């Protein structure tokens, strides 16, 4: 009887401790900010793609579509982690401005630069401190992808200014798990970030 009571008290104590464990407040805040940022980027890049098409810049439009898909995957991943922490994301409306494709590319470069050099490093520092491993993973996938997007956008802007957009990739592949993005002619056998086989990639 004493053993049963002791075991029961341990279980109750564990449940009580679990219920009263502190929430990773900063990481929750960062996940929400990341969801807003990635969702907005996804919608914005689709709008940029339509603008590029209207200007006859099909290769740049493809790049924007691929990046939009990747950003959407990042938003979904961030949302899953947030919900596993018992928090729901509030509704919001993405806000952005569409200009010329040259201006849109520069805006995209600026956004990706901020995310990879400032936003995600800060998010990762907080996630590591609060020991939220799944947040660390989704933030890392997003940050590493943004580095590649910046490179693609920088190349596209240079080719646009040189009136040589026909030399850009005519297609892209996006990992459905982490959002990693490849030029269609440079796809790995498996995603370099998460190991997903290339036959699962989304072809743009």
Report residues per predicted region.
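Intrinsically disordered, low-complexity segments enriched in polar/charged small residues
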Residues: 7-8, 117
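Positively charged n-region of N-terminal signal peptides that target proteins for export
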Residues: 1-5
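Non-heme di-metal
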Residues: 19-204
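Bacterial N-terminal signal peptides
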Residues: 8-15
